[in-house]
């Protein structure tokens, strides 16, 4: 299975409809993390952009999942890039502690 990074562009103004969908969106994201479909999820401090590292067979299959995000209709831009290398501390064995 390939890894993809999805770059999201959030709306310039956030209205009540957007805010009301956040709990459902977070629950959906958490479920995808538990199912190992999403590996990492981040939103910029200024809340204008987001990055999601996802596992999927193809960019089209990743796009299909992103389109299910409860906040999808508010995204002004979605870019999907397949990764050649993805390395992180979370994907390594834990360090051994000699107590």
Label each PLM-derived region with a short phrase.
Residues 1-99:
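Conserved, structured core segments of small domains
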């Amino acid at each position: 299975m390939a890894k993809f990074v999805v770059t999201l562009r959030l709306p310039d103004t956030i209205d009540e409809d957007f805010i009301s969908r956040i709990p459902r969106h977070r629950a959906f994201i958490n479920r995808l993390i538990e199912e190992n479909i999403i590996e990492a999820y981040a939103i910029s401090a200024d809340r204008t952009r987001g990055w999601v590292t996802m596992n999927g067979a193809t960019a089209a299959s990743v796009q299909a999942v992103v389109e299910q995000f409860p906040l999808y209709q508010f995204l002004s831009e979605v870019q999907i890039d397949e990764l050649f290398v993805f390395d992180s501390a979370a994907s390594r064995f834990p360090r051994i502690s000699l107590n």
